[in-house]
Amino acid sequence: MIAILLAVAFGITFTLFTTPFFIRLFRKIGWGQFIRLDGPRQHAIKRGTPTMGGLVIVVASIISYFLANFFLGLSVEPSGLLVIFMFVGMSLVGFLDDILKVRKQHSGGLGPFYKVVLQSFIAVPFALLTFLVKDARGIPHSSMSISFARDTGINFSALFSLGIIGVFSAWILYLLWINLIAVSSVNAVNITDGLDGLAAGAMIFTMLAYVVIGFWQSGQNCARKSLPLENISKCYSVNGPLDMSILAAAILGSLLGFLWWNTNPSKIMMGDTGALALGGAAAALSILTHTQLLFLVLGGLFVIEAGSVILQIAFYKKYRRRIFLMSPLHHHFELKGWAEITVVVRFWIIAGLFTALGIGLFYADWLYS
């Protein structure tokens, strides 16, 4: 618990006190935000606001994670490093997108196709590493089961019994599944990052959930020798859950400090550099804690935001009419007359409620297992 609190404290301190320096630096080198021309007119004043603040979040989170472990003499575990791999990898994709926007002086960076391809180049190696990297007992960090609050009976490895074709099919399905989780997550967070502080505040709740989940899984881990006899049937086969909890806490703290400068009116924006990184970290945590489907609840706001875009496009293509005044959903409410800060705070409340529901479902699964 002390390591978790330290990680939060380090994260807050780093971003709270260093972000002003990066605001000045990014403004000086011309890393300014470009606003979509078809967006709400009141967003035009945000043009030129320093962007790529996600760099601050990523660096602060990683430093805070290592410092928290170092101060308490804890070993950095492969589970945390795997999350960092996805965190940094997706951040680099976002950084490339942001750099292209700055150089082209346009709100369009990487095209959708190239963005998904690059995201897949991060997600697929991550999926392979979760099996290739094993703990001290020789157990991989992931399984081929689809998970909710723990692994379910849906297991791609059941295809192994079909011989070489079955083994090949199982691996392809597993890689596609992990890629779907990762790509969906990073793009959902990116879609949500359209108002000052919205994505950062919502992700704080998601990271809080993974702090709680990782800490609980650590106490109820199957590898613990001191586990009460009555809890053995409920234990979690998760590698390094406490380490992931510490990393989630570091990200949470970094977001809290960053939000001080990112809230309306924003002095700096995280850009795709931050949004893709956060989506990648959340996806990695859901995979490594075996809570893949539960992530749909924990990140419910991101699901709604991404879903509003999908619905808008599909409905318009079929009926030539729009469901919303504008998608994503937060822009719809802006055009309905809601103030930006009103939309953000109400969406934060929704994100918090989804997180509470998700943690409740997680605990209920343990209670009734």
Swiss-Prot record:
One of its GO terms (biological process) is cell wall organization. One of its GO terms (molecular function) is UDP-N-acetylmuramoyl-L-alanyl-D-glutamyl-meso-2,6-diaminopimelyl-D-alanyl-D-alanine:undecaprenyl-phosphate transferase activity. Its EC number is 2.7.8.13. Pfam families: Glycos_transf_4, MraY_sig1. The keyword NADP does not apply. GO terms for cellular component: plasma membrane. Its cofactor is Mg(2+). It is found in: Cell membrane. Its main location: membrane. The keyword Signal does not apply. Pathway: Cell wall biogenesis; peptidoglycan biosynthesis. It comes from the Bacteria. Belongs to the glycosyltransferase 4 family. MraY subfamily. HAMAP family: MraY. This is Phospho-N-acetylmuramoyl-pentapeptide-transferase. It comes from Tropheryma whipplei (strain Twist).
